[in-house]
Amino acid sequence: MPLFATNPFDQDVEKATSEMNTAEDWGLILDICDKVGQSRTGPKDCLRSIMRRVNHKDPHVAMQALTLLGACVSNCGKIFHLEVCSRDFASEVSNVLNKGHPKVCEKLKALMVEWTDEFKNDPQLSLISAMIKNLKEQGVTFPAIGSQAAEQAKASPALVAKDPGTVANKKEEEDLAKAIELSLKEQRQQSTTLSTLYPSTSSLLTNHQHEGRKVRAIYDFEAAEDNELTFKAGEIITVLDDSDPNWWKGETHQGIGLFPSNFVTADLTAEPEMIKTEKKTVQFSDDVQVETIEPEPEPAFIDEDKMDQLLQMLQSTDPSDDQPDLPELLHLEAMCHQMGPLIDEKLEDIDRKHSELSELNVKVMEALSLYTKLMNEDPMYSMYAKLQNQPYYMQSSGVSGSQVYAGPPPSGAYLVAGNAQMSHLQSYSLPPEQLSSLSQAVVPPSANPALPSQQTQAAYPNTMVSSVQGNTYPSQAPVYSPPPAATAAAATADVTLYQNAGPNMPQVPNYNLTSSTLPQPGGSQQPPQPQQPYSQKALL
């Protein structure tokens, strides 16, 4: 295959657009259109060959190539339309419009306008309209669709006649036109000579009428234009032309000009004195200027005062009155009508702003609701971190190494006696297993020698201690805390028994436990077995 393959359409296109053609060969043009769809590259090859002839230096060849291009667009279908709506064709069009002959450019622009109208419903062929838009922005003018200029540009101009017979026929037509013109001139000359030798009857009557037609001026008239006649009242004016009923042409000693017919009279016997008593003078002053004053349209704006004033006037007007409306009322009504579109726009703006504020309000309420929800939730992680660092018990600074525990109360809770300055008392809730072990522990006699001689006292402290259910955490041993109702019932029953028994109650020994028997925070003693945790609540 050669490097530069020949275009199969070059020979036919050159023949259809030859410089020697005197008319379009439509048979060959239609054959080219049929040949386009026979191969896959047919549309591109045909368009390339046609545009090569459009760029020809001979305008006659370029015009024939544009005619062939229009025929291909009309007959070859969408396969050729896609090639026309390509970037290559757009660059070729720009080159032709910049360097081509004016007639060629006009015809190409007319074809593009026609194609834009045909391709407007197909989005794949929108490049033509975009190309026209870009060229218009660059200053290129395009004719309107269906205009006379577009039709004339699309029409093929008269081809240059190369046939001698055609040239001869054209020359004969020109000679015939010249002969007709000469004969008409001779007829006009003969008619003028006859009219000079033998005057016509109409001309004699007209001359006789002009010679005997005289009128007298009854008013003074001063010419305002150059072709008008100035005269005074009482002057005799010779009428030259009275074909116009309003303005006649007359002659005086001052010259010839036009004058109004109602300023003269045909009665020539009237005395000048009588005419002077009845005459009316009309004078025109150049200083007088007639101006039509039109009220300037006031700019429309929303004025509540004017609307209130109009409503007040309408309420005070009697509808049964036959008198016309006041001009002020009509003026205010017109102005209020002009405010209508502005009021509609203002309402739309207010509605839009109200919608935006409503959306913002919803967002703010959602944010506040989320904030309130987060604030009401238990800070579980912070409480856990705080309580994790606390020991299982609190040892008072004012107490020695041993702590005195009273007898086991009914609720099973042990109170640690501490310093009197302590503002809080800590309650320990021990599981039942530890309570049983504590109750069975053997206390040496030397631990508390004063036990036999002491009076038995109730093991209830004066300080009120709130029983709070403890929180259980993964790092601490769960403790059992009886329900508040059970604790309160047990405490009430014990107090009642104590009051009824009095001094006859048996003495209960106090257990004096050393600190070594209690669980230490850092000791090696194993914590009690974990139990099922109950509810977790924050400390009150």
UniProtKB/Swiss-Prot annotation:
Region Disordered: start-end pairs: 500-540
Biased composition (Low complexity): 519-540
Annotated compartments: Cytoplasm; Early endosome membrane
Domain ITAM: 370-387
UIM domain mapped to chain residues: 171-190
UniProt GO MF annotations: phosphatidylinositol binding; ubiquitin binding; ubiquitin-like protein ligase binding
The keyword Kinase belongs to this UniProt entry's keyword annotation: no
InterPro entries referenced in this protein's UniProt entry, alphabetically: ENTH_VHS (IPR008942), GAT_STAM1 (IPR047492), SH3-like_dom_sf (IPR036028), SH3_domain (IPR001452), STAM (IPR050670), STAM1_SH3 (IPR035657), UIM_dom (IPR003903), VHS_dom (IPR002014)
Residues where Phosphoserine is found: S156
Membrane topology: Peripheral membrane protein
Protein's GO biological process: macroautophagy; membrane fission; multivesicular body assembly; positive regulation of exosomal secretion; protein transport to vacuole involved in ubiquitin-dependent protein catabolic process via the multivesicular body sorting pathway; regulation of extracellular exosome assembly; signal transduction
Positions of modified residues (Phosphotyrosine): Y198, Y381, Y384
Cross-link (Glycyl lysine isopeptide (Lys-Gly) (interchain with G-Cter in SUMO2)), chain numbering: K276
PROSITE patterns documented for this protein: SH3, UIM, VHS
Residue ranges occupied by any VHS domain in the UniProt entry: 16-143
Lineage: superkingdom: Eukaryota
This protein's UniProt keywords: Cytoplasm, Endosome, Isopeptide bond, Membrane, Phosphoprotein, Protein transport, SH3 domain, Transport, Ubl conjugation
Pfam families recorded: SH3_1 (PF00018), UIM (PF02809), VHS (PF00790)
Keyword check for Cytoplasm: yes
GO cellular component: cytosol; early endosome membrane; ESCRT-0 complex; intracellular membrane-bounded organelle
Domain-related comment: The VHS domain mediates high-avidity binding to Lys63-linked and Lys48-linked polyubiquitinated cargos.
Subunit structure: Component of the ESCRT-0 complex composed of STAM or STAM2 and HGS. Probably part of a complex at least composed of HSG, STAM and EPS15. Found in a complex with HGS and E3 ligase ITCH and DTX3L. Interacts with E3 ligase DTX3L; the interaction brings together STAM and HSG, promotes their recruitment to early endosomes and decreases STAM and HGS ubiquitination by ITCH. Interacts with STAMBP/AMSH. Interacts with PDGFRB. Interacts with LITAF; the interaction is direct. Identified in a complex with HGS and LITAF. Interacts with HAVCR1.
UniProt record similarity statement: Belongs to the STAM family.
This protein's name: Signal transducing adapter molecule 1
